[in-house]
C-alpha cells in the first residue's frame, strides 16, 4: 500500500536513533517491538496440570502424561519417580519438588507441564506456578500433619492442600474426589469448572453435581463413565 521495500534485516538494531533522534519526535519502537512479539491480552501460558494428594498422585501424573504424549505434544513430567522431558528420563529420583517443577516450566521445549506436588513441598516452598489449567486433588489425610512446622490439625492441613485448587484458572478445571469429604469442600474455592470423580455410583455429591449441570466421572470395575448433567 505504501510501495515500501525491505532493504535490510538487522538482528541487533540500535534503537537509540529512534528513541533520541537528532531532530523530530522520538518514536516508541521498543514498545512496538514488544507488542508485536507479545500482543496485549494474548495468553502465553502453556497448559499446567497440577496433582496433589496423600496417595495415588504419582500413577495419576504418569497416566496423564502418557495420554498427553499420545496427542504428539512435548510433555514435561515432574513426579516422585523422576523428571521426564518427552520420553526421556532426566532424573530418576524424587522430583515432586518446587525446584524440579520450576525446571520443567523453564524448559522452552515443554508444551504441557504435568507436575506432582507433595504436601510437605507445598507447605515449605509453595507451588512453582501461579495458575494452572487443571488442578487435581485426590485425597487428604487429616492426620497427616507436620508438627515440626506447627501444623497440628486438619484445618491447617486443609489450608495447605487447597492451594492446588486456589490457583485453577477461570477457564480451567478442578478435578476433585467426591468420596473424600475434605476434598469436596474445595469445590467452592475453584475459579473454574469442577469435575468430581467417584467409585460410588450412588454418591450424593455426584447426584447433586449432575443436577446442577456439572460433569462427573464414575469409576467402575470394568468401565469409566463420564456424565454431564443427565447425559452419560
What name fits each language-model region?
Residues 25, 29, 33, 47, ...:
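General structural feature for long, well-ordered alpha-helical segments within catalytic domains
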Residues 48, 75-77, 135, 194-196, ...:
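Conserved beta-strand scaffold positions in the cores of enzyme catalytic domains, especially
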Residues 40-86:
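Walker A (P-loop) phosphate-binding motif
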Residues 35, 66-70, 106, 188:
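Short, well-ordered alpha-helices that flank and scaffold nucleotide-derived cofactor binding pockets
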Residues 1-52:
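ATP-dependent carboxylate activation and anion-phosphoryl transfer catalytic cores
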Residues 12-16, 82-85, 141-145:
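A short, flexible beta-alpha/helix-coil linker loop
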Residues 81-89, 215-230:
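Short polybasic amphipathic segments
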Residues 89-210, 230-232:
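Flexible active-site lid/hinge loop adjacent to a nucleotide/diphosphate
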Amino acid at each position: 500500500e505504501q510501495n515500501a521495500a525491505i532493504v535490510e534485516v538487522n538482528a541487533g538494531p540500535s534503537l537509540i536513533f529512534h528513541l533520541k533522534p537528532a531532530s523530530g519526535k522520538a518514536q516508541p519502537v521498543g514498545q512496538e517491538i514488544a507488542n508485536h512479539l507479545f500482543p496485549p491480552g494474548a495468553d502465553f501460558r502453556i497448559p499446567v496440570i497440577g496433582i496433589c494428594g496423600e496417595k495415588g498422585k504419582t500413577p495419576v501424573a504418569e497416566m496423564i502424561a502418557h495420554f498427553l504424549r499420545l496427542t504428539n505434544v512435548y510433555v514435561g513430567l515432574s513426579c516422585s519417580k523422576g523428571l521426564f522431558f518427552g520420553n526421556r528420563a532426566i532424573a530418576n529420583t524424587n522430583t515432586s519438588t518446587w525446584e524440579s517443577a520450576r525446571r520443567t516450566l523453564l524448559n522452552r521445549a515443554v508444551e504441557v507441564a504435568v507436575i506432582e506436588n507433595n504436601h510437605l513441598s507445598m507447605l515449605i516452598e509453595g507451588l512453582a506456578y501461579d495458575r494452572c489449567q487443571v488442578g487435581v486433588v485426590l485425597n487428604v489425610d487429616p492426620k497427616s500433619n507436620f508438627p515440626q512446622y506447627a501444623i497440628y490439625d486438619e484445618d491447617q492441613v486443609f489450608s495447605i492442600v487447597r492451594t492446588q485448587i486456589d490457583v485453577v484458572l477461570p477457564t480451567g478445571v478442578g478435578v476433585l474426589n467426591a468420596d473424600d469429604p475434605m476434598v469436596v469442600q474445595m469445590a467452592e474455592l475453584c475459579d473454574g469448572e469442577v469435575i468430581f470423580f467417584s467409585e460410588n455410583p450412588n454418591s450424593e455429591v455426584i447426584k447433586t453435581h449432575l443436577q446442577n449441570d456439572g460433569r462427573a466421572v464414575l469409576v467402575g470395575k470394568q468401565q469409566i463413565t463420564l456424565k454431564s448433567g443427565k447425559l452419560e
